[in-house]
Amino acid sequence: MTFRTQIGYFVLLTAALAAPCMEWSFDGKEPLRSDDGRTVLTGSATVAKGAGITGDALRFDGKKDFLELALNDENRPRREMTLSFWIRPEAGCTEFPIVRSPRRDVVFNGSSGFYWFEAYTADGRQLYNGCAHPRRLKSGEWHHFALVYDQTGVATYLDGRPTGRADADKATGELRFSGVPWRIGGRLYESGGKASGFFRGLLDDFKVLPVAKHAFPEVEKIKRQQRLNAAGFRSNAGLEQARRNAMAARFGKEAAQLPFAVAGVSALDRLLPDDLFTGEIGAPVKFTAAANERENRQLLLLPYGGNNLPGVTVEVPGTLTDQDGKAVPFRFKVSRIEYAKLPKPSPFMYPLERIPDKLISGDTFDLPGDALAPLWLEVFVPAGTPGGVYRGALSVTAPGNPPLELPVEVKVWNFELPRRNIVPTLVNVWERDLQTYVPEGDAAGFVDLLDQYCTMLLEHRLNPVVLAHAGLVAPWVRKAVYPDYRVENGRVVANMEVFDRLVAKYRRMGLSKVAIGPHYNFDQTKLGGGDWWTNIRATQPEKVWSFIQTHTEEQGFLDDAVAYPIDEPEDNVEFINRVTGMLKRAAPQLPMLLTSGGANYPDPSIHGVDIWVPILHWTNPAQRKLEQAAGKPVWTYVCTGPNYPNPNLHSDTPPCGIRMLAVGAARFGYDGFLHWAANFNTYKNAPADEPNSFAAGEGTYIHADGSGRPVPTVRLKTLADGMEDWTMLLMLEERNPAAGAAIRKKLEALIPERKYDPARPVALKSPKEGSFHTFLDGEAFFPVYDQPELWLKLREEIGEALNN
């Protein structure tokens, strides 16, 4: 450190030390006076004796109470600040966090589901962001909030953990000081002479510090103890003893001597490594499913004493017995959940260091003693399995210990999910990445890899797009494997052998939509530069598409075929109409599918589209209903956005948000689902965090192992569960319309539509995101995020209605 640097550091340190640490415990005779006696809060609030985290707290009535903090040149934060406090909202409270400067020097307020934070620098830069909670914060519980300003930006913390951040492009300098007192707990907003934004509940331990504090171990310790207390325990030792007692009660006194306890956990609960599990121990693992359906649970093995437990084996049964004692085959699979690094969270989500993602098969499992490490347990009920209740056990063995037999029960409804995917879908396999795992010239190896990915998608009720990205693969792959449509000497030439073979195989497996034909986004018509339409015209597309229609008819899948020639052309109406017009002339029986990108589809200025695919938050709802009434399906999709709390496939989207992608699409009246990539950026030797570095892994819910073979994820399994939910709903509506309509009403009540004026016009590009201005309210999903069992109960009703 140079002498000048030392002087500068000393000046900053001295300035920080000179500013007071303003702290309020709200104890003593003058509760509104800071603990050092130098600063007084003004306003109204009631002292709640003995109700604080320690000692007393302040209670706000949610109607008129609020406080103000007057800052001046002596006490105001400058280059660094930590604003922190504990609050305990009361039932019905909608405002928290609870601090806001009327001039927006500092803003830190929101609701139980989402909060907003911002700070202005002295030179006028606005640093801001928002943060969505995986589940809404509960009233009646203490929550600790902190907002930290330093020379890199602004960060927020909830209960001691990082939750949000807004980075500055350069050193922030001083925090803006407008001279207007900050509001605390009320009158957070004023408009037209009326005040709003009043907190109802308790406030304790309010601090404004002149330093940036980015670690809160004392808060995490308090929260952990609160969770123990809420579960009825005073210590970790008490929790472990209760687990031993529960194991003995379930399995006999010898089970208390095993080095672990066992618990079953819903697949819709996201378990993070440092979570504290206080749930039920030793209960039988139960599933409910139709024949030809997969269902999932998590199996949690909990070592005692913080001791690592290597080499644990889990043996799953091959059969279960029915009520007559007959052995009936079931397919169980157990996998280790790998916690992946997440370099950057999706917008508004907590920056979690590790997230549960890949599912790794293995014969033995090494369990850490200091972190949760759940296993994933899947059961597949074979087609033809009669309805009834089937029982058996799985065996868990730790080295040097006797096996534990954990009861398993599967209730099978007396109906079967169809082999064919009745919910139309299309999902792209990113073939560009597969080619990196095979040597040049190994066409068979490439096709084998592609087949594994397509098969995995089909097994999870998703239709793969087959051999669509010819322009993204090496010339030798394109020539050997792809149709590579072209016109030579006036005739169409295409290598259809591999495509036809794979499509025939997949249709036997349940493929219900076949995307066929050139995909102009990924060939030289666009990638080569120049005018896109001129380049397409040069390929003689009428001849190519006429050939394709004839070929699909000859192969027997014209009824399932769709043309998907362009992707996300947005408001390029003239270009779109040229493409659709060409296609209608050349292949009038081949329906054209069109994705929207950042435009509000459907739109009446666009002609010749047979299947509209607006992105979830770029939908014109009035036009959608008109198109559907005219017999034209309207699917939906997601692509990097929308962001949580809207459903999506980001790595950090909580499981219920992924399942609600399918359920929500069904609820809001879409007819199908498309997704742009299942395995994006999984090329050979990609950095370990490469898939998750783009859009928080939203296009990567199938990974690749070292040989390129597909590796499933929690997200794939959860999305598949949602697709099965959607399938069951469609089956019920077809078989029993009255029962289906009743379920629809319950689903609409569970996930309400935003209130909007249906007469308000939604233009193609304005408002920019039509769904957000009309029917789609991300926070409407919070009830089911808070209590996933609400959806599981409704799913049970669907199953029972079909069962009867």
Model-derived features: positions:
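Extracellular glycan-associated modules
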Residues: 19-231
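Short, surface-exposed loop/turn segments at beta-strand-coil junctions that are enriched for proline
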Residues: 74-76, 380-387
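Long, low-complexity ectodomains and other extracytoplasmic segments of secretory-pathway proteins
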Residues: 225-285, 294, 305, 401-442
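Surface-exposed binding patches on compact interaction domains or structured appendages
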Residues: 238-281, 298, 304-377
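Short, solvent-exposed loop/turn segments enriched in Ser/Thr/Gly
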Residues: 281, 292-298, 373, 386-393
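Aromatic-lined carbohydrate-binding surfaces of glycoside hydrolases
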Residues: 302, 351, 355-365, 371, ...
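Catalytic domains of carbohydrate-active enzymes that cleave complex glycans
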Residues: 504, 509, 517-533, 537, ...
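Catalytic-core region of carbohydrate-active enzymes that cleave or remodel glycosidic bonds
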Residues: 610-691
